[in-house]
Amino acid sequence: MTIDQDMSIDDEISEESIYKLKESVDTAPKLELIVKESLFLEENLKIKINALGLEESSKKELNGKTYFGLPSPVDEKINKKIDFPTGNNDIINTNSDIHYGVQFRIKFDINEYCYYIKDCSYGRGYGTFMKVINSMKIRDNMLINIGNNYLVITFGVDDSEPEENNTIDENQKILSIKVFGGDLVNYSYVFNANQVNKILIGKDEKCNVVLIDELLDDVHCMIEFKNNKGWILYDGYENKNSENGTWVSLAEDTQIYDGMLIQSNQNIYLCHLIENQQ
């Protein structure tokens, strides 16, 4: 599927749904994205979104979806899709168009009465991530960013175990970590919860996964296996959060909560939900 095809599918919404969105503007919660760190945007700038989309949008018709991204120097079709420009592509890389286009999308779900966010970069640029606050359950094919490193987490079969022992539950106990970026490229670690149920990741030699990166804490994050819960990702170690955070890709639609931190294209946004008083 091409990027254009996927984006057109994401745009499909019925007239009935748009009518419901319009009716919900005065009662639905509003969302503010507050710029906390940026190379391009004013600090503490508030980007206001309601059930229909970006407030003060230049679009004539809103459909409950707001697209953030970098305008293209050559592709007006992409530019028309972007509701909020997140910077100047010339500043990022004057010799490449890899960063331009839609970076992420926020939509209001009329049935659940809440906002969802999804990365729409499709491998272009830096991607869109949310900061782990305390802990998060790991899912298969999860992408994690810590410092200059990207970790792809997958579940799998342990070839050292007899085939009859590789049940669905047992497969969930096998965790593979593939490292990209930094000093390690395409380097993989495999852990079996029956042997190691706590995995320390950081730059200290005591860690199970050692990454040479000055942006990391000695123990930057931890992955722990818990019975009946599976693998859990924790930011920091021993009740102390990491300095630069542990970030998880928003490759799937994820519900936005008050206080959520989002990182995209070297911008960090704080999400603030405002309940409507009407």
Predicted segment positions?
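Regulatory inter-domain linker segments that are low-complexity and enriched
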Residues: 1-45, 149-217, 224-229, 265-278
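Forkhead-associated
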Residues: 55-140, 193-265
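Internal, hydrophobic cores of structured domains that mediate oligomerization or house catalytic pockets
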Residues: 144-146
